[in-house]
């Protein structure tokens, strides 16, 4: 799709645009951003960015989502071969760095197109019209000035020039009409279209525009160009576009698509066009179209500059209208832009295959009849009426000889009724035609009368036989507005129902652009003077217009994203039932109606409401309004609350079971789903910023929810369905040309993976591994004519297969996870527990709050069930068993046909597939043959089923499915039709699914995880999220070890046969109860061990029980698996960790007395025998807990020892049984009595990392039966857990499991364990690691240190109650490195942490230096494999892997970098300053943003105020502690201890509550400035403001965003990596310090000049003041007091920096109060100088007001003024410097 555009300059005849389409080069016109142009389009559009500022145009005023105008006009039928890429109508140049100068063809045309980030519409440049003449060129002039979008239709009939000015600058002046300006006026910026249509090549027309100049702020055209030179209909033949547009002649499309950032659409000017007499025949139906058109003179008599602006809500107030004057015809009015805006693409209509009414087609056809050149034939044309339209296309294309394109055909329409315009819904724009309620309520007579008139008109104007396409909208009963002419009625039918709710008020339900509708109204108003129209009608129209105005006023507040609610309202109220509904169209391809193109295209797709509800009526059948309405109402009821996007009904999903592929039938084309994903991937990869909002969710769409994804893209105006399909089709065509027969399967697969990667890549590299690979391999994957080579050809081509790369990457991540001995176990499980319990609550709430509209859910459920069965197809038919086994199991998962599954010759696969199929049948059989309609019957069946299953267990799959389906409301029926397993995102495929046996439950679960995200809310159903993650982690774990398997390692790897044999053996034996045994676990052990530990032999041997199992669990598979994997593990852990095992033992004695009494006693009695073994394997506790330890040891044995295993044990048991029970009861009582939270925490700490926990996790899927027969020692650990788990399938924290009381259980949820890697991903399951003595030693040392330093425990309690990330990080850092334990919480360590300056690392990121690190890591991985799996692996192409990993890391890191920057706690404040106080500055980039940031520093002010008071108090007390010698003895002296301190304290404390009134009031400014500074730079660490450290990186890794987006393994690996990052800060040079000070001064709004002058004069002033100050105190103090003087001197030195602490007056110090002469002046002066930065308090210095209370110091006011003037906090800054400083702080490299 990306063309080698630069090569197209020379090729004038691009008949086969396909040839050029796939020369994918990064030189692409868009520089990798935006939608690629087809070769053809590149020829057509020569766009050069003349404006230097273009790339600086950061998305300032631009709405978040920009509508790409994607118009696909590719049709295979007829002469229309241009299948390839007319795709690019819009491109976002989002990178500042990309300035695209693009002039592929002979520099003839240069569009100065400045890219507003998201809003630029590059007109509909898909000129697939064989109608040669129209290319929509939207010239958007840059920056804020004017967006002049001139779409001038070649058709003489309409030249609508819309001038859009973004920043409200004046558009074209009214006196100078743009067409009358001459070419001499061209400016440098202007676009000169001097191209001629080559007359040789353009058979149809001579030259359309000779000279056209689009200027930045005005449009200049030569009138002659339009009037004289448009001979559109003369030519007998329309050749293909390449001939037509030879030399890139730019035909400017008629109606401008108006998009401006602010959605200010200014100007459909009112222009009067006078037409010759010939045109009056049929309004818009020009039967003699050739001749007439030649004679048409376009005279613009007036250009009324009614630039009517559209609000951001796209309410059009008054858009000027074309008054077209047709002589002899009073109803000139009816020829509105419809007739003349011939450019419109028939495109959108067809989007709905069912849409047989072609309102748009009619319009198009009409235009075709009289304006041949402008009709854009789209692919979709064929689809509108699969039969009729196709004929139309053929006729249009082939039968060009006829004067009328489809003159003799049924389909030809001569009808230019305005009703035909009404096909496009433009949401957000209020149609003036909306019928006010009062009109609706009119008397029956009037209404009937109107209806009769209307019906008559329809009869007269429609010849049903001849003009089948002449569908005149038969209006709804209540909404007929039509005007009567002597001869004809121009129909303006507003097909709204009475029910039009006020939500919908803004939306023109006529499918015409609102401007058109308003124009029509204006036209009608003009024609009202004709006597044919009576007063009532004029009043009616007037009412309509008034109502429109009112509604527009109301709707101003509405924001664009209300489309959903609007759509829902429309559907509920059946408001949007257009009779000739061609509503289902692409928002961006405003092809269907000229109208859409004509006047307004709102930069948000939201303007166009996509209605699935459109009933498709054949053109031939023109039914009465009632029939259509009925059908529509039915349909709308079916789809009631679904977000109806047009594409829903427009394609069919076809499954090719033989080839295991899935196809989409669209516009009579079959598109393989793979290519759809490929295209989406490419699009996302090229426009990451654009799709940023989607990033967290993409991977949840990936294999099965293509439809959901497209719908979401539609909904948020990011991509259009037609565009996607069209592009995908082109891609597929290109690929088919180049492909080799053996490449197909792998390419599809790889591409699918790539797609997903790219999806996730969008902004933050999505699924870690996937995105990395795609990014690194973009060229290979997407840009070569041949997509990635097949696996089988890997060796010969020496290409790295993308899947393999992903496997390598993910595999290494997983192994690294295994490798990191830092224990994630407890942490992860605790977090999971916490999240799951929380998540359940959240999930329930969400269930209620979601838009659970019944039909919607029905459809979702049906579609999801149905899709489980039908649509999941294996796209990879590699015969290689390993490949199938590993890569394709999941692809096959949900096929019900065993044939597909049998392709995989592995027994394991067959078994699992059978299970899956049975499950699917059982679960979904009632949905097999149903369509996407939500029948109540199905709903009832579903309810019945769910009820049944709910009875069986508390948590069942059906519950979850239901919840998930409800959560997945965004996935409507149609979405789920596209569910494909064939494309598996590489990460998911490799990490989650590849090696998992085909398991419907797993698949279902995985799908459910995709549905976890509610895009509307942007939230996750945490319940489902966590549950699914657990099992995904099983899959990941399996993947970790399977990474060694053949399919996952490139052929260049040599993998020893031992490994695969081991795997296959295990596979044969392995079939877990619910098909979810993890190969990972199996591979971790020897065959013996794995047999003993991991297999339920009954399940393996008794396949007879399979059906029974399936029937029992088919509804509950998801949750049951969860119970087995997660609950057992966590319960087992908690039994070891949190409750003294005696309690759980006691409970079990109660529950299973017979079995366990024997076991317990025998275990304890034989404790000594087993002690050694027990200690080695399990106990890391210290000697302090001996008694408990003994009980624990006994307990492990007691549970696991088998009765009758050793006779000696039985004998001992009988002897000692009584004693044992007594002992147990005693210890239990003791423990219960004294247990506290501290004890719980202590126990958790002490037992936290014991390998008991890790090993108990291994036993997740085991049952008692399994272990009874095994003598393996490992079972000693397991039975304990398993028995417990069997008893408790319910709540994890149920008291039946451990007797600990409820408080404890609540507390359990909160516990965190510092031994774990606290920052590692909490979702990851514990990793099974062989016993490691080093770990035991480490734990013991920690325990010793804990005992030694009580501070440690205290801090842990404190830290984890607070969950302060800083403390946790410090704790984590220190615990992982035992040497740091002694200085555990010293500030120095925190400082050291922060000194690891990651920003420095980023700047000097030399990836070569990382090579050694990665290689070392790989070596460790291999050792780990050897230790755990007993396999030796050799890697031959290490360098290749290193490069892959490096690229992956680099791209990820750079994607995460903005997050990391933002996470910097100092950096957050600078965003406040940028968005807060600097926002109103002249130069601010954020002036127009709606973001408001409020920094609440009131608490800081209070704090500093209190601190200053405390300082005073302390100072006072100090002075009291050293009594002073007094000059004279006084009887007035008061006792120090009695009154004074208390009084003083009271006064000080009261000041606080009185809003600082009192002595302290004068210091508010100082306090405030301190608070400000503190807020600006936390803890005054100015230097750190610009530093980003590994600490920030770690915080980001642990953020929700990364949790959703990156795999746990990768994040964990990164956290390990971070531990090794010790980049010390760059030392500060004088230059850096100086620079920083300058920036800081500007930032804090200090005036640099004043500060400089102050610093110059400072020393002199100080000397003066010092003298005065000393003298002052000498007077006070009297005779020599040397000590006192020294003290004063110290104070003086700091006088300008510190708060001056006023000591309280002594009563005996009498100072006469006298008024200061300068008091008033000082007040004013200080008041002006002390306005504070955040304007919390602007106070004058009232200090003097309070002087009289306590006397005065001589000259004190001057001292205060000195402080104020010299205090850096008080100084002022100029706004310019402030703004500059703010921007500088955005630069992370400031000091590195």
From Swiss-Prot:
Record's description of how this protein is used: Possible candidate for an effective malaria vaccine as determined by epitope response in sera.
GO cellular component: nucleus
Biased composition (Basic and acidic residues): 856-873, 955-966, 1060-1071, 1088-1106, 1166-1192
Comp. bias regions, Polar residues: 169-182
Regions of compositional bias (Low complexity) in chain numbering: 1-28, 741-776, 874-924, 1045-1057, 1261-1289
Biased composition (Basic residues): 550-559, 838-847, 943-954, 1205-1215, 1660-1686, 1704-1717
Keywords in alphabetical order: Merozoite
Disordered, as annotated region: 1-34, 162-187, 440-461, 544-568, 736-777, 837-979, 1044-1071, 1084-1106, 1160-1215, 1257-1290, 1651-1686, 1704-1731, 1742-1761
Name this polypeptide is given: Uncharacterized protein MAL13P1.304
